[in-house]
Amino acid sequence: MNICGPVGKTVLPVCSIRSINGGALCGSVLAVALFVIMTAPAFAVPCESLSSLKLADTTITAAQSIAAGAFTPTPTGNPFKDVPAFCRVIAEIKPAKDSNIKIEVWMPISGWNGKYQGLGNGGFAGMIGYPGMAVAVSRGYATAGTDTGHAGSGTDASWALGHPEKVIDFGFRAIHEMTLKAKAIIQAFYGDSPKRSYFASCSNGGREALMEAQRFPEDYDGILAGAPANFWTHMLVSGIWDLQALQGDLKGYIPAAKIPAISSAVLAACDAQDGVKDGIVNDPRDCHFDPSAMLCKEGDSKDCLTAPQAEALKRIYAGPKNSKGQQIFTGSVVGGEDGAGGWPAWITGTGPGKSLQYAFSNGFFVNMVFEDPNWDFKTFNFDTGVKIADDKAAHALNATDPNLKAFKARGGKLIIYHGWSDAAISPLNSIHYYNTVVETMGSQDANQFLRLFMAPGMQHCGGGPGPNSFGQSGNPKAPTDPQHNIYSALEQWVEKGVAPDRIVATKWVSDLDPAQGAKMTRPLCPHPQVAKYKGTGDTNDEANFTCVPGKK
């Protein structure tokens, strides 16, 4: 009698039927059985059974199998047609009495790549990022997202008023709890833990990313932090500085109609300094644009600045200082004024009090610092108010610790990126944090696990006139190879030990439709290197640029 032995963890029945050639039938049975095993769903328990899973401080409110292309994010929304079948688990976590952290964990029914990807939040959070989760699960990852403990729009901070535990959840606890619970749910579903765990997000999500590296180094093997709002308290003091410059008496207010002229003047002064005239300020630190050059000679028009407007512009570029001249936060840089993600959205707004900066800075101080709905930003004192903000909120919200020794010791890799044309968060802040890590840990140690890539011409997390597509969070349109995709480069560094020394970024003819082709490609170089034109060839082709030493 021929006996078919065990295959993997499954023991096949004894083959008791002989064929004429003795054993061929058993071989056929084995082949069929192997096919069944290899094509069966790769999970340990049915998705729906996860509703009874017990986890600390956690209630699982739903566990359901979602058919391919069937998930609809809202009752009136359109289904995510390209998303494969997945197991959706919804849970609420209550680590503190006033906590109510909602998370969702999505796990591919088939084709799991053995990895977990945690996702963060922009602004004040308040919702789960379904589009990012859809991209992750479509690429084979088990993934998780959270509302960080409250419901609301990303520009609303009213939930924080009188709720210090919710501020802690938003600051760091929710992402860590999401990570722990997601890994436990993944283990229960597949019968195996993730082989690798990654976190990727931008803006406030970049702050969350650095918080994970600093406070919970065991959570993730690789972290991708975009445009991090990590010096949260001082960043929002900077917003108040800008608001006072523009709206203190309204004489300095710069209407959106004047922004294109400011942008043109900046480019005229600084665009060609890197040897290429391409509508991009390659490194704004090399630009010494003087707003006084735009002073109106007669009357006023959209093409010039009044004296109070020129002074307001200088203050915004300089950044906040106290009465002793000490810098509180880095100022805005030149080159990010115009465009959909420029100053009319973030700094000047479409009118006084109608900017995103007003929503975030005023919302923070009203609800998390002074806890007074009637507080007026014009009363803020830059000598005393900064300490008040730090004492009240820095412990929960700031992710500025440069000591990443524990993260390095566990083999973690961290990549930070920031657009040089970011009007929301000064890109100089990311350079400052990178430099403090290098100073704290030494350049040799820092180089083993940390990289910073600055993206000329890119606005906040994406968009802008420069090459802005390279696989960063919220921009899945880039190719997936490590040479063109910063997330894939992070994976390659973690899993193969190959550190990224150049990322090719693309500017599409249409940012919304890459099928129209590339308008420009350009290398992103690891800071402090910068891309320099070789002097010959098409300036729209990255092959004609090389990475050379730049300013630290």
Where are these predicted regions, by residue range?
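Alpha/beta-hydrolase fold nucleophile elbow
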Residues: 193-202
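Cap/lid segment of the alpha/beta-hydrolase catalytic domain
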Residues: 113, 123-191, 237-238, 376-386, ...
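Gly/Ala-rich beta-loop-alpha elbow adjacent to hydrolase catalytic centers
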Residues: 201, 205, 209
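A catalytic-pocket lid/entrance helix-loop region that shapes and gates access to the active site
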Residues: 211-212, 218-321, 468-482
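Catalytic-loop region of hydrolases
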Residues: 43-115, 130-131, 276-277, 281, ...
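Conserved alpha/beta-hydrolase "acid-adjacent" motif
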Residues: 424-428
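Bacterial N-terminal signal peptides
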Residues: 27-39
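Short beta-strand/loop motif that positions the catalytic acidic residue
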Residues: 416-418
